[in-house]
Amino acid sequence: HRLIRRQRQMCIRDSTWGTPYYLKPIKLGFDMSIVSATKYYSGHSDVMGGSLAVSKKVFSKVKAAERITGLRLGPDDAYLITRGLRTLDVRLDRHRENSEKVAKFLSRFKNIKLLYPYKKGSYNYKMWKKYYSGASGLMGLKIKCKNISSVRKFVNSLKLFGYGYSWGGFESLVLHQEHREIGTRKFFKLAKDEHLVRLHIGLEDPSDLIADIKQALKHLK
């Protein structure tokens, strides 16, 4: 943040994961906070849109750019996002509670490393605890497994998780991040026998989700 200030550049933060409910970037000194309204804001995966919150210092510049580009959100999307925002706090707290229970279950398995800040010693916990007031439903699993087909079977055998790239809606989703490129695997610090699976924990009963994951884990060999 200080380095960016010295370079006289704008400091921008993508706040989609925690939303402003759990993280307030402008109060931390950021110039802009971007959120994909397609996700938690709407909450039903039926909207295309985004939001941009800015500091007073850059407001006039952003307003001028907005007038030039003429970007506008459609009335139907605006209505659905506004409706979703009314229940954002209730939904996010449920996502967090469900995710903590799922994370606690998954932490038992030595072949799975959780990429989720749910307790002391977990991934990025110190930084998360310093700036965030809560965690959302998106998490990553580093699965240690020599056979990639076993990972695919694990993903495909999940019955309560839809397969999809987006997230932030009411439903639970899974995505197998098949990184075959050497550079990408290096970025995620994946060993040859490690595979990345992304889970979004939705609003379903957490005991049902855990039972579903448990039956799917038997495919990991």
Sequence positions of predicted segments:
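Single conserved hydrophobic/aromatic residue that forms the stacking wall/gate
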Residues: 1-12
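General beta-strand structural signal in soluble alpha/beta enzymes
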Residues: 13-15, 33-36, 75, 114-116, ...
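Short acidic loop-to-helix transition motifs that present clustered carboxylates
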Residues: 16-20
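Active-site PLP attachment segment
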Residues: 26-80, 84-88
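Short, well-ordered beta-strand elements within core beta-sheets of diverse protein domains
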Residues: 81-90, 137-145, 197-202
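Conserved small-domain helix->loop->beta segment predominantly found in fold-type I
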Residues: 100-159, 163-168, 184-188
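PLP-dependent enzyme catalytic core of the Aspartate aminotransferase-like
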Residues: 145-149, 157, 172, 176-221
